[in-house]
Design a protein with these regions (language model features):
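Conserved beta-strand-loop surface patch within small alpha/beta domains used
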Residues: 1-80, 88-142
């Protein structure tokens, strides 16, 4: 599985994640499936509603956020294909918390933000049996 996004969209994610630091930030990936590829056409930031004292290592959104983002993607003729979030002062590797709360068939882009700077970004897909994530290929295009 390869996930394609533009440099501009990657920079949008990096900027949001750096502004969210030292807390986690996140949002939705909007796009479409093309065979084994997922094309990201837009990213939509969503506010972190986790308890303030936990936002440095947890991210959550409301069901209303989810529904609104689905409507927005539908209006564009696209779909919610994934979710992105940051790991402040931690690697771009899914945590067990991420695995427990993830959905199969959704891609997960994780950005490592060290000392306020986005330093790494990786894409992951949860196995159907929810036992672990598998690494995908992130293709950043001009």
């Amino acid at each position: 599985m390869a996930v394609h996004l533009t440099v501009a969209l990657q920079q949008t994610i990096f900027g949001q994640m750096e502004r969210s630091f030292p807390n986690e930030g996140g949002g939705f990936l909007v796009g479409k499936h093309e065979g084994e590829n997922i094309i990201i056409n837009d990213v939509i930031a969503v506010a972190n509603v986790f308890e303030t004292e936990e936002q440095y290592h947890r991210y959550a959104m409301t069901p209303q956020n989810w529904a609104a983002m689905e409507d927005q993607a539908d209006a564009l003729g696209l779909a919610l294909v994934g979710y992105y979030h940051s790991h402040p002062n931690a690697p771009a590797i899914p945590s067990d918390y991420d695995r427990v709360h993830a959905l199969p068939n959704f891609v997960y882009v994780i950005t490592s933000v060290m000392k306020g700077q986005a330093v790494d970004q990786k894409v992951w897909l949860l196995k159907q049996d929810r036992s672990a994530f598998e690494a995908g290929t992130l293709v950043v295009q001009p």
